[in-house]
Amino acid sequence: MGIIAWIIFGLIAGIIAKLIMPGRDGGGFFLTCILGIVGAVVGGWLATMFGIGGSISGFNLHSFLVAVVGAILVLGVFRLLQRE
């Protein structure tokens, strides 16, 4: 899937990741969107690299779930790094 689609998915996935993992992360909505975009791109890259579920392309449920999982992972890593 193109990078533009991952960015769009990332914006939405970042919001959903924040709803799933609420907390005070600092940076507010802007940081949530950035982490979501990074997470979606990382999730898409990892899913493609490991061949999880075939090809990740287009706007479909599988691609969206990969974006949300990636955003949750990036948010978790961000929180771990923020504690140190």
UniProtKB/Swiss-Prot annotation:
S-S bonds: none
Record's InterPro entries? Transgly_assoc (IPR007341)
The GO cellular component terms are: plasma membrane
- Which positions, given as ranges, span the membrane? 1-21, 27-47, 58-78
This chain's source organism reads Escherichia coli O127:H6 (strain E2348/69 / EPEC)
Q: How does it sit in the membrane?
A: Multi-pass membrane protein
The cross-references to PANTHER family, in alphabetical order and at most eight, read:
UPF0410 PROTEIN YMGE
Protein name stated in the entry:
UPF0410 protein YmgE
